[in-house]
């Protein structure tokens, strides 16, 4: 299936980006990527990821840890996804994460008429996998 306007949203806190270029190349074969955003706490162990993402044309969104081990990355990604859905006419959303918290978002996007592709680790939850139209291991 080919798409005209693809949104790529990366949960950098919960994603291995060792194959970022291959991931982007694959998504590009599916259509035109018009939005690239990545979310995470870049001040800690994600500094190298931030640089790689920026070099690949991603807008990097920074969220501090409010309490140890927790930040607003997930909710920020979800808010942006819903905001983008209602402001523009995108036909596909790509969510790169292994976090099952994105299951309700993937279902909401599907119910709103867009095609949802998930990318994540092989141990990503069945709920998130099944919430997407398709899911690929990275």
Predicted regions and their residues:
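Domain-level signal for Mg2+-assisted phosphodiester chemistry and nucleotide/NA-binding surfaces
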Residues: 1-86, 107-110, 115, 123, ...
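General alpha-helical segment detector with a strong preference for membrane-spanning helices
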Residues: 15-17, 103, 137
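Acidic beta-strand-to-loop metal/phosphate-binding motif
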Residues: 39, 91-98, 105, 109, ...
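Short hydrophobic alpha-helical runs that function as membrane-insertion/retention elements
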Residues: 60-62, 94, 117-118, 136-137
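Short beta->alpha linker loops
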Residues: 72, 97-100, 120-123
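A short acidic, glycine/proline-enriched capping/turn motif at secondary-structure boundaries
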Residues: 84, 100-102
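Class I SAM-dependent methyltransferase SAM-binding "motif I" and its flanking Rossmann-like core
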Residues: 128, 137-138
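Receiver (REC) domain switch/active-site residues of two-component response regulators
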Residues: 133
